[in-house]
Amino acid sequence: EILLDDARRLHEKLLASGCKSRLHIAPERWHAYVLYNLSENMEQDFSEINRFLTKVLSPAKSLRWMRLDNAAKIYPAAKRRNWTNFFRLSATLTEPVDTDVLRTALDVTVRRFPSIAVRLRRGVFWYYLEEISKAPAIEEDKSYPLVHVPFDDVRRCAFRVLVYKNRLAVEFFHAVTDGTGGLIFLKTLTAEYLSQKYGIQIPAERGVLGRLEDPDPEELEDSFLRYAGQITASRKEQTAYHLSGTPEPDGFLDLTTLMLPVDAVKAKAKEFGVSVTEFIAAVMMKAISDLQTEKVPRRMRRRPVKVLLPVNLRGLFPSRTLRNFASYVTPEIDPRLGDYSLAEICKIVHYRMGLENDARMMTAKIATNVASERSAVLRAMPLFIKNIAMKAVFDLVGECKSCLCLSNLGLVQLPDAMAPYVARMDFIIGVQAKAPHNCGVVSWDGTMYINMIRNIREPELESHFYRVLHTLGLPVKVESNQRWT
């Protein structure tokens, strides 16, 4: 359906080119339909239609650009030659993914997410994001997740879509979005794919956005700037125990997935009087503590055990942004003071989360980061000097302050029409620049998937983590891509 004058011109051109065409004019309307049949080898037909669609219906528009949000500014500066901060979300479907259908679904979806369908651009004073003009090519998934993405590729597109059999995966550069925003993108892409593939109607609910709607301006905002408080928080923290091992020489990432019944984990967490996230964090801290005890027999040489727990700030503030909007809490124990039981660690994690996972505390943390961004000295620095300064800050107060990051996206909810087509969900966060482990958690359809990734050969932490869960009587299934030599 197009404007009448345009329809008439297209109709006449199609007839002149030898096509069969009929013009249907809507009564008392300025619109019409053009029905046409193309003959074989009618290249001129296609060129005329393509010209009409691209030049008249979809004229070229200037590409949108956005400043990096407050949390994102550190990621381009912190990059290494063989490391960029990516994370992965994937949906395993009940049938093999049709890449042709997925390609058209991706074309629709990227237009709905102008803050994610972007590339990283370099300015004089800051990096910034620029909307991409078309969707990236769909790639075949590799033998392991989160294969290193060269920084030049991020400058072309800051996310990638990968397919392997039934699995549809999206990997995001962390400067673009966080786990919550990435999950909304994956849900919406999967919904559009299923709609096109099976002709089902999937409503815009439970994290699926309306694919043909215009983006809401609130989805594009930097919510850190909006909710920064007046009082700043201290960044002073002790350096944590550093996990180590034999690096994989070719950059291979070993992935171990532990699968547990959600109900069993909830029941066990309730026994300890903590939430599911607090329970999993306590188990991880217990595993790290046990591993350090083995490796460092002398108690006074041990370092604090700390796990960084991301907090989705959308739960504390009324934000709808699809960009980064998360902070963190870092519970810790100090093994030099003595041994800790799992119950004691659960109590420490619970009270630390209760103290810091609070809107007032978080506004102070946000204010600390925003104050740095607003510094007149930093703003005046050329980008190449900023990169040096920000990388030094990242090394000083970033990853060395925790053993690893444990991020739990919680229980995934999907529209009822969509759920029967999804067999599994996974969330994997890349290893840190200077630490060999990280852990992503997500639950779907009664199963919790704990994805532990590492860039060293020894699966020592995974073994200790499994041992703690097994000792508690929890049924655990394990799968791994580890190479046996």
Task: Locate each region found by the language model.
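Conserved alpha/beta-hydrolase "acid-adjacent" motif
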Residues: 2-9
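Catalytic histidine neighborhood in serine/cysteine hydrolases
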Residues: 15-32
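Catalytic active-site module of serine/aspartate enzymes centered on a nucleophile-bearing elbow/loop
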Residues: 34-59
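Non-catalytic N-terminal regions of enzymes
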Residues: 59-218, 265-270, 275-297, 400, ...
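Long, Pro/Ser/Thr-rich low-complexity/intrinsically disordered regulatory tracts in eukaryotic proteins
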Residues: 80, 190, 304-310, 353
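Flexible, P/S/T/G-rich "lid" or insertion loops adjacent to the active sites of thioester-utilizing
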Residues: 221-274
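Helical lid/core segments from catalytic subdomains that handle acyl or acyl-like groups
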Residues: 255, 324-412, 417
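Long, internal scaffold/assembly segments composed of regular secondary structure
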Residues: 255-338, 343-347
